[in-house]
Amino acid sequence: MYRNVLVWPNQKLRAENEKIENVEDVQDLIKDLIDTCNVKMGAGLAAPQIGVNKTIVVIKPSVFGKENPDPSEYNPDYMVIVNPELNNQGEEIKWKEGCLSLPDIDAHVVRSETTLLKYTSEKGEEKRLIAEWPFSGGIQHECDHLLGKLFIHRMDKKKAAFLLDRWRRKKRKARIKAKRALKAARR
């Protein structure tokens, strides 16, 4: 089932997230994450982004040009990552990211070239994966949400503040324009 994606500065995006004890308890959440990610055409989605403070993300490896190493039973295009532990290694790479929780913003951030990922699958199996670039960058981005971080928190504070200020002004202008259009339509 589709759920609304929370937008910054919603505090649920920064809250602490609970580890999942039993994957059987989150099967509906997995479906909701995948359905929502599909509707929003995202590369991945973390549970906090739909208001559920649990440590689970879904990601679509094909967006990063990778074959899916652990296809979901619900939708094989997606990989489900529960209770991830990351060990980022290799060179740092600067690349442009966007986020469903910060619509219409993208910016360059630094990510590690390789990620050693330990996680639980949707079937409750303990797994390990070595993710290479750019898939590793996508995994790091989604797992940052479980730490209460968005990509802007990986940027220089002044650059992030400038970007967010510009974003707020753009949103405010869009609201004013929408109100004017609604008012004109009512005449």
Where do the PLM segments sit?
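Positively charged
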Residues: 1-187
